[in-house]
Amino acid sequence: MSKDYFLSSLIKCIRKLYDKKIIAYPTEAMFGLGCDPTSEKAVKRLLDLKKRSIKKGLILVASNYNQIKMYINESKLSAQQKKTMFFHWPGPYTFLVPANSLVPCWLTGQFDTIAVRISAHFSIIKLCNVFGKALVSTSANISNMSPCLTREDVLKDFGKDFPVLYGHIGNESHPSKIINIVNGKLIRYV
């Protein structure tokens, strides 16, 4: 990976995030679309772009726990549940956790939970560290279509000027597993 090209694309993506725009970036298994989770405008743009219902809720991805802690109602998590999450993080595991009562419905959808993941992927770590907070993360595709696996796929599907962080997807062959930490149910396992 060209360090200069990566840094140039990182700066461009961070600027877009601050401007409440949507970006694409490589994740563990595919390219993702992301935006600032604190911006209703940005999240609604992302949902419109994907043609995704607000009722479904979204995933937040972070480089460390402090970036997602404010979204979680920790009083509803046991020590064992936290231990389970930290055992699997950083990595390709997303957990549905009780949402803090202040988390907006544009993130939780129709649920009282929020989906969170701490990633081990270089690109996500860099993005979240430089941006200083978690990102909304969803697959780079129109709902019910195949996800983008390369930068070229993203540019083909979303336009040649779409901001894409330079890099490659990780070695996972499927999207992250989603586990409801409260009841232990596996929501998504492909």
Swiss-Prot record:
It catalyses: L-threonine + hydrogencarbonate + ATP = L-threonylcarbamoyladenylate + diphosphate + H2O. Belongs to the SUA5 family. TsaC subfamily. Gene3D superfamilies: DHBP synthase (3.90.870.10). The keyword tRNA processing applies. The keyword tRNA processing applies. It comes from Buchnera aphidicola subsp. Schizaphis graminum (strain Sg). One of its GO terms (cellular component) is cytoplasm. The gene is tsaC. This is Threonylcarbamoyl-AMP synthase. PANTHER family: SUA5, THREONYLCARBAMOYL-AMP SYNTHASE.
